[in-house]
């Protein structure tokens, strides 16, 4: 975990649109955390972090891999002699990669992942990736991205990873039919559900990024319509648009309402009638509504404060307010991408207090003053707030857990009900 303190004066000011912009001390996980879910998604990929022992401990602890399993990630640990320039770090990296690929011949895609230490000594991993890719081609493709915690939040690791894939995606034929590309790592079960729903809607040219295997990289071009499944993929979306793809504006598929609007936006882009969309999703939407009903009784009227951490805070706030009936005290987000979140912002209750960026001490003061029923925050804040008598929900759990789609709407609501139920039981 990185605690950033800025030497400049702390700033906290409301913008003309009412968003509180904060530029002060921050507490965040670094982008290396994304490896925890990405290494499970791309089955023939391997993530080699070029970093310190601290980086290695973070990934191993967060992933919770069983000791007899062979994970698809590792850390090339930079020692003092590397940092001091006593050895050629590139030679050492080449040696480690050669050993790794000899031992793990099933690897077809290797990511060299930068960290704070590798960036501090200016180790050029992009040149290393090009050199190693040429050396091990065509059997292995080597790419690189930064998972550094310098000026980032932890979900940017996935954004950087997917953005690194965009330049190597094959170009679609000029005669290719319009296709849909769903962007953002989803659990396999969620991906399969969406595939079935898109097929039922009549959208059969559907691909997902990241794919399950590197051999399944989707072809893209001007006829590719991009549908974001996660709200933190700004760099990836920009890279896809630069290659001619067109993004579909939509809310994100959290809860029954969000999923319905997300699917409807895709259907509209492919000329599917509104009536057919309603007929197709009605049973799924009704099932989500039934699953949410039990949790709405527990959560309606409860006050929630969301600290900026994961970049999914605004879609979560929309879900909690509109589908669960919770009262939004403050909704913080590390970065506010107004274009990608326009549909979500329009659905928030009028007067919702939004904050962008972080000044953790000021936000803690506001949270303490408000005494909300539930606080959604990072791991570093959860235990101290619990000690002060506040009930918390770890925001990182909302990234690790499958929460997208109709079938997972009840599971998403349960994640917020569980800490309140725990608090009730402990109070007895």
Curated annotation (Swiss-Prot):
Its EC number is 1.3.7.7. Pathway: Porphyrin-containing compound metabolism; bacteriochlorophyll biosynthesis (light-independent). Coiled coil: none annotated. Keywords: 4Fe-4S, ATP-binding, Bacteriochlorophyll biosynthesis, Chlorophyll biosynthesis, Iron, Iron-sulfur, Metal-binding, Nucleotide-binding, Oxidoreductase, Photosynthesis. It comes from the Bacteria. The keyword Transmembrane helix does not apply. The keyword ATP-binding applies. GO terms for molecular function: 4 iron, 4 sulfur cluster binding; ATP binding; metal ion binding; oxidoreductase activity, acting on iron-sulfur proteins as donors; oxidoreductase activity, acting on the CH-CH group of donors, iron-sulfur protein as acceptor. InterPro entries: LIPOR_BchN/ChlN, Nase/OxRdtase_comp1, Protochl_reductN. [4Fe-4S] cluster binds at residues 30, 55, 116. One of its GO terms (biological process) is photosynthesis, dark reaction. Its cofactor is [4Fe-4S] cluster. Pfam families: Oxidored_nitro. Binds 1 [4Fe-4S] cluster per heterodimer. The cluster is bound at the heterodimer interface by residues from both subunits. It catalyses: chlorophyllide a + oxidized 2[4Fe-4S]-[ferredoxin] + 2 ADP + 2 phosphate = protochlorophyllide a + reduced 2[4Fe-4S]-[ferredoxin] + 2 ATP + 2 H2O. PANTHER family: LIGHT-INDEPENDENT PROTOCHLOROPHYLLIDE REDUCTASE SUBUNIT N. HAMAP family: ChlN_BchN. Component of the dark-operative protochlorophyllide reductase (DPOR) that uses Mg-ATP and reduced ferredoxin to reduce ring D of protochlorophyllide (Pchlide) to form chlorophyllide a (Chlide). This reaction is light-independent. The NB-protein (BchN-BchB) is the catalytic component of the complex. Protochlorophyllide reductase is composed of three subunits; BchL, BchN and BchB. Forms a heterotetramer of two BchB and two BchN subunits. NCBIfam families: DPOR_bchN, PRK02842.1. Belongs to the BchN/ChlN family. This is Light-independent protochlorophyllide reductase subunit N. It comes from Bradyrhizobium sp. (strain BTAi1 / ATCC BAA-1182).
């Amino acid at each position: 975990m990185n605690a950033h303190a800025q030497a400049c004066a702390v700033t906290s000011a409301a913008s003309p649109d009412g968003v509180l912009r904060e530029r002060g001390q921050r507490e965040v996980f670094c982008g290396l955390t994304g490896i925890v879910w990405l290494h499970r998604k791309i089955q023939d990929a391997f993530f080699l972090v070029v970093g310190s022992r601290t980086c290695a401990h973070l990934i191993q602890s967060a992933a919770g891999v069983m000791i007899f399993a062979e994970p698809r990630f590792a850390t090339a640990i930079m020692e003092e002699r590397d940092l001091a320039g006593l050895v050629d770090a590139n030679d050492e990296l080449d040696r480690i990669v050669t050993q790794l690929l000899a031992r793990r011949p099933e690897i077809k895609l290797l990511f060299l992942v930068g960290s704070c230490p590798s960036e501090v000594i200016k180790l050029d991993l992009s040149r290393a990736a090009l050199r190693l890719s040429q050396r091990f081609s065509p059997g292995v493709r080597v790419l690189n991205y930064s998972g550094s915690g310098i000026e980032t939040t932890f979900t940017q690791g996935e954004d950087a990873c997917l953005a690194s894939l965009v330049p190597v995606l094959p170009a679609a034929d000029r005669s290719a039919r319009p296709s849909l590309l769903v962007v953002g790592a989803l659990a396999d079960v969620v991906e399969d559900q969406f595939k079935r729903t898109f097929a039922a809607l009549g959208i059969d040219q559907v691909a997902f990024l990241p794919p399950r295997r590197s051999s399944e990289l989707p072809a893209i071009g001007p006829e590719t319509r991009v549908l974001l499944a996660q709200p933190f993929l700004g760099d990836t979306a920009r890279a896809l648009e630069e290659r001619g793809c067109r993004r579909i504006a939509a809310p994100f598929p959290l809860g029954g309402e969000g999923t319905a609007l997300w699917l409807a936006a895709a259907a509209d882009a492919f000329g599917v009638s509104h009536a057919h969309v309603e007929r197709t999703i009605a049973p799924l939407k009704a099932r989500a509504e039934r699953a949410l009903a039990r949790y709405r009784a527990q959560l309606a009227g409860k006050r929630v404060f969301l600290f900026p951490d994961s970049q999914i805070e605004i879609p979560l706030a929309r879900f909690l307010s509109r589908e669960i009936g919770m009262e939004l005290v403050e909704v913080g987000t590390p970065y506010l991408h107004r274009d990608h979140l326009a549909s979500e912002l329009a659905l928030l209750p009028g007067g919702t207090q939004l904050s962008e960026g972080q000044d953790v001490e000021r936000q803690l003061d506001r949270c303490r003053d408000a005494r909300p029923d539930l606080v959604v925050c990072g791991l570093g804040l959860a235990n101290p707030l619990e000690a002060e008598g506040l009930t918390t929900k770890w925001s990182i759990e909302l990234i690790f857990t499958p929460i997208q789609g109709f079938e997972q709407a009840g599971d998403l609501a349960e994640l917020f009900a569980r800490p309140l139920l725990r608090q009730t039981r402990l109070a007895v």
